[in-house]
Amino acid sequence: MVETSHALPLVDVVLLFAYKRTGKTRVSMAFKDYSRAKKGGAADTLYFNAFTEDLFTWDNDLEGDSDRYLSLNTNSRFFNGLKDLVLDEAIARYLHRYADFEFDIDYVDWKITFHKRKAGARNIKISRGEQSLFVWCLFLAICERMLDGHESYQWAKFLYLDDPISSLDDNNAIAVACDLVQLVRRAPSRKDQDGADAPVKVVLSSHHALFFNVVCNEVGRGKDGPKLAHKRYFLQRPDENGKFDLQPTEETPFFHHVALLAELHRAAEPTGRLFTFHFNALRSIMEK
């Protein structure tokens, strides 16, 4: 974690690849604690991780089965200035790229209702995958305002994205990756309200190999915007002392299948442990 923090002043973006159950969320929380300790306890990082989606909870109207909505936990700083930011249009612009449902945000009761674009059904319960997409689109809209230098997010000096997509098909994974990089390109040139330089440093971690590869390729391209200075790492499982190992990958092609084989080898050892994702990894390798 300290290595990642030390790398950030030298680059615009740090990219971490790690398998499921490696501890990516723990690493993001360690980053938060380390950063806050350096700032005397003041928050300076805008996060997207497992805790972000927990800020949204369903009321399924079990009695009437008709008034279903998603509640927002407005105690979180994540929603600072949400009402004044007028995000509906920006959220819809992203959401229409990935899904076919509409939404309405009630800023009085802080709840969100959904309906189908074509069928017209109201107050529908969307799937978990659709909910993840909506939360992600809301987050992108907030990031836009943050990078615009809006006063509600002037406190954010870092942007930490932990597994922004967990279960998307390949087409959406590619689209989300490209949209994200287009937004991140603005981070180094952010200005504050007085016009002074206020760059944002970005950390992205993911277990999704295709998504990670697309992001790596896009941040290194200068065709559609400025090339971003970045470092790439493979985050390995913590050892018996709980210490994580970061393997740099800038000098060689991204070694997804080699790393999978190494992980399977460790799991097969007498001291290793097998989890569901190991079987999925084996199937992935056998299908290649």
Task: Please tell me what each predicted stretch does.
Residues 272-288:
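Conserved helicase/translocase motor-coupling segment
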Residues 238-268:
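Conserved small helical "lid"/interfacial subdomain of P-loop NTPases
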Residues 1-11, 36-50, 105:
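N-terminal nucleotide-handling cores and adjacent loading/scaffold lobes of large enzymes
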